Design a protein with these regions (language model features):
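Alpha-helical transmembrane segments of multi-pass inner-membrane proteins
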Residues: 1-10, 19-34, 56-59, 103-106, ...
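Aromatic/pi-system hotspot detector in well-structured domains
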Residues: 99, 156-157
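Alpha-helix C-capping/helix-to-loop hinge sites
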Residues: 87-88, 142-145, 169, 269
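Aromatic- and kink-enriched transmembrane "portal" helix at the membrane-lumen/periplasm boundary
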Residues: 83-88, 145, 149, 219-227
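Juxtamembrane transmembrane-helix termini
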Residues: 167-169, 173
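Non-cytosolic membrane-interface motifs at loop->transmembrane helix junctions
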Residues: 149-156
Length: 289
């Protein structure tokens, strides 16, 4: 509840000091949730890892301060990077690199607010609805039937990605950097699609034994590329296809138009072999909208 309330204040509060307080509450909420979820008997090890993480995050914040546009570029590159973590009897596939980026962004945001940065409500008209949603998510943990799962959702999804949204919104977006991000997104999607086609041809699935077992009994063969789950892989490709489709529909530069069209065709082939119904539904919805 504390972390979600802090995130809500950070998103919508009108003053710098209020936002600093919200950021502090967000950070404290993160720590308390991590302590609650940490396996007993391994907390000293996790505390040591946390200290190392803080040092690396501070260094990352210094890098982002010098080159702020690394934030969206590195964030996008970290999307598929799930690290298999085992602590005692607890196993999980976590977005560890992404959480490192979020921590660096949090330290940079704290520094900027401390130094008197007057910006507020960077998310514009979405600030109040998102703040209300964050607060509601935090409150809902008070009556959830599964407290542990609620804590996991807050710690690994809502709290870090809420702050990341604020950090990204603070950047002075322009056409050049949007194009750079599109190029990175398209290049990653093409590489991932090629890896997916390799998996289909060789029948070699990475990371996830559940997909291998499912393929053994299914009439089709699903691939996951470098992602843990075929559906997550498919959704990443859908985002790339829709971004390229915007270029096809609205860009007048012939080279960009041809390149985007070819990319859509190649990425779609990779998407097909994910056999992800949710991804195809998202693609249809995105094209219609």
């Amino acid at each position: 509840v504390l972390g979600a309330a802090g995130l809500a204040v950070l998103i919508a509060a009108p003053g710098r000091l209020y936002r600093l307080g919200g950021l502090a509450a967000w950070a404290l909420g993160i720590v308390l949730l991590a302590v609650y979820l940490a396996p007993h008997g391994h907390r000293p090890l996790l505390a040591g890892a946390a200290v190392l993480g803080v040092v690396l995050a501070v260094a990352g914040a210094a890098v982002l301060k010098r080159w702020p546009w690394l934030l969206p570029l590195v964030t996008l590159a970290c999307v598929p990077a799930r690290i298999h973590v085992t602590v005692g009897s607890t196993e999980a596939n976590l977005l560890v690199p992404m959480y490192g980026v979020v921590a660096a962004a949090a330290f940079l945001l704290a520094w900027e607010l401390w130094r008197g940065d007057p910006r507020m409500r960077e998310l514009g008209i979405a600030a109040w609805p998102l703040a209300a949603f964050a607060a509601w998510v935090g409150l809902s943990i008070l009556w959830t039937g599964d407290l542990r799962q609620g804590a996991i959702d807050l710690l690994f999804f809502y709290l870090p990605f809420g702050l990341l949204a604020v950090a990204l919104a603070r950047l002075p977006w322009d056409r050049l950097w949007a194009l750079a991000l599109l190029v990175e997104l398209t290049a990653l999607a093409l590489v991932f699609a090629a890896i997916g086609l390799y998996q289909y041809e060789t029948r070699d699935i990475f990371w996830n034994p559940k997909v291998e077992i499912g393929n053994a009994y299914a009439p089709f063969y699903r691939v996951n590329s470098v992602f843990w789950d075929p559906s997550i892989y498919g959704r990443f490709l859908v985002v790339a296809i829709l971004a390229c489709l915007v270029v096809v529909l609205f860009e007048r530069d012939r080279r960009l138009l041809i390149g985007a069209t070819v990319a859509i065709a190649a990425i779609w082939v990779g998407l097909y072999f994910s056999y992800s119904q949710s991804s195809f539904a998202a693609l249809v919805a995105g094209v219609i909208l």
